[in-house]
Amino acid sequence: MAVLFQEEVHSHLRKRQKQKQTLVRYWKNSRMITSERILKAFMEIPREYFVETSFADQAYADHPLPIGEEQTISQPTTVMLMLQLLEVKPEHRVLEIGAGCGYNAALLGLLAKEVVTIERHEKLAVLARANLRKAGISNVTVLAGDGKLGDLEHSPYNRIIVTAAAQNIPVPLKDQLAVDGILLS
């Protein structure tokens, strides 16, 4: 019985690895994602850690998935395109608005020196912290609060990314951006 279970687990792991590789091949062949650092981060972070268990088999499907509180984890292509546009460097400090389940913050954690992410739903902030711990990411701080206010205490930030839909950029976020920084919404 234990051998069958182990074989099933290994089969699922191989399937997910193949799904990841298929997405990376698609992004490379289409020249959609050209940053090797971002592609490497995608391969390193297990997206299945950040989705509900019932959706683990869809972790690498290129569409959003529900994460609770009527929120979703963005589809992988959207996440990767935003990260590429953000042009994060290893020495950067990044502020993310909209932590969700923590997946984007985990990728940012591999790309940047330090990440602060703000989530308005306390339950999702707790989930993001747990998911980041599970993924072994230690340079990301998850705050629960109003992302429109940013995080003045730890500013300025080299990069600010708003992962939720926003009609306009709140002034506090602009004020917390470092000189020559990039703010993406």
Each model region followed by its residue ranges:
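Class I SAM-dependent transferase core
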Residues: A2-L95, Y103-A106, L111, L124-L127, ...
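Conserved nucleotide-cofactor-binding alpha/beta core module
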Residues: E87-S185
